[in-house]
A protein has these predicted regions:
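N-terminal nicking endonuclease/strand-transfer module with a His-rich metal-binding environment
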Residues: 1-161
Length: 161
């Protein structure tokens, strides 16, 4: 069974500055961690920008930062960070995690949040980083999903794979 880690809550990390969010995105999108058979396993939703923007951590950060400035939000927390880890037995093909990751960020994007993913395959246990903006781009309200609600929806997506 995949493990869902709620990084903010489990490790008491806030991503209190824009630079913290930018550093997180750059770490997650690192090509040495996300490259698989010539493809980068990263992305962002909901925007329909060209792929080179959606796979660039600095561009993704600019989308999120613009959203914060629209609401005059200059103090964090700025993002929710989730990590979904798989054992070697659970994940035989790294490329299959891309569609799982896209479905997970669609869950957040469909509810009005900019969300990004990065699949890391450079470790024994493959894992997906999910980074979600704290402000809704639709109505500028703060992130308000309970842990149970997120967990049950992510698990439902994982059970479909």
């Amino acid at each position: 069974m995949p493990i869902i880690k709620f990084v903010n809550e489990d490790e008491n990390i806030e991503y209190a500055k824009e630079q913290d969010l930018c550093s997180l995105l750059c770490y997650a999108f690192d090509s040495e961690k996300t490259e698989f058979q010539g493809h980068r396993l990263v992305g962002c939703k909901p925007f329909g920008f060209p792929q080179e923007y959606m796979t660039n951590p600095l561009a993704v950060h600019e989308f999120m930062e613009f959203n914060h400035k629209r609401q005059y939000k200059y103090q964090g927390p700025f993002a929710k960070h989730r990590v979904i880890s798989f054992t070697q037995q659970e994940c035989l093909y790294l490329g299959s995690l891309k569609s799982v990751a896209e479905n997970i960020i669609s869950f957040y994007a469909d509810r009005g949040y900019v969300a990004a993913y990065a699949v890391h395959g450079n470790t024994k246990n493959h894992h997906i980083h999910v980074i979600v903006d704290m402000l809704s781009y639709q109505d500028l309200t703060l992130f308000h999903m309970s842990r149970g609600y997120e967990s049950s929806n992510i698990n439902a997506i994982l059970n479909i794979r």
